[in-house]
Each structure stands twice: as C-alpha cells, then as structure tokens.
Amino acid sequence: MLALKISVYTIVFFFVGIFLFGFLASDPTRTPNRKDLESPQD
C-alpha cells in the first residue's frame, strides 16, 4: 500500500511540475513587451 501511495504521489508531482514549468516557461512569450527574448543567451 505504501508503494502505491508513493507511486501515485510521484506521478502527481511529476505532472504538476511539468505543468508549472511549461506555464512559467511559455508565460514570457505571451507578453510582447519582453524584448530580451529575441536574443537568447545560452
């Protein structure tokens, strides 16, 4: 039962993390006021 709970929490946090990361990563692209996005600094 503990393994099931751990696996469920892992999957939930995994998808929540991906959703939050994708939302925060795509958020500046929706704001046309950000001019620094045109010159990516890797």
UniProtKB/Swiss-Prot annotation:
This is Photosystem II reaction center protein I. Keywords: Membrane, Photosynthesis, Photosystem II, Reaction center, Thylakoid, Transmembrane, Transmembrane helix. It is found in: Cellular thylakoid membrane. Its main location: membrane. The keyword Membrane applies. PSII is composed of 1 copy each of membrane proteins PsbA, PsbB, PsbC, PsbD, PsbE, PsbF, PsbH, PsbI, PsbJ, PsbK, PsbL, PsbM, PsbT, PsbX, PsbY, Psb30/Ycf12, peripheral proteins PsbO, CyanoQ (PsbQ), PsbU, PsbV and a large number of cofactors. It forms dimeric complexes. It is a single-pass membrane protein. GO terms for cellular component: photosystem II reaction center; plasma membrane-derived thylakoid membrane. It comes from Prochlorococcus marinus (strain MIT 9301). The chain crosses the membrane at residues 6-26. One of the components of the core complex of photosystem II (PSII), required for its stability and/or assembly. PSII is a light-driven water:plastoquinone oxidoreductase that uses light energy to abstract electrons from H(2)O, generating O(2) and a proton gradient subsequently used for ATP formation. It consists of a core antenna complex that captures photons, and an electron transfer chain that converts photonic excitation into a charge separation. InterPro entries: PSII_PsbI, PSII_PsbI_sf. GO terms for biological process: photosynthesis. Belongs to the PsbI family.
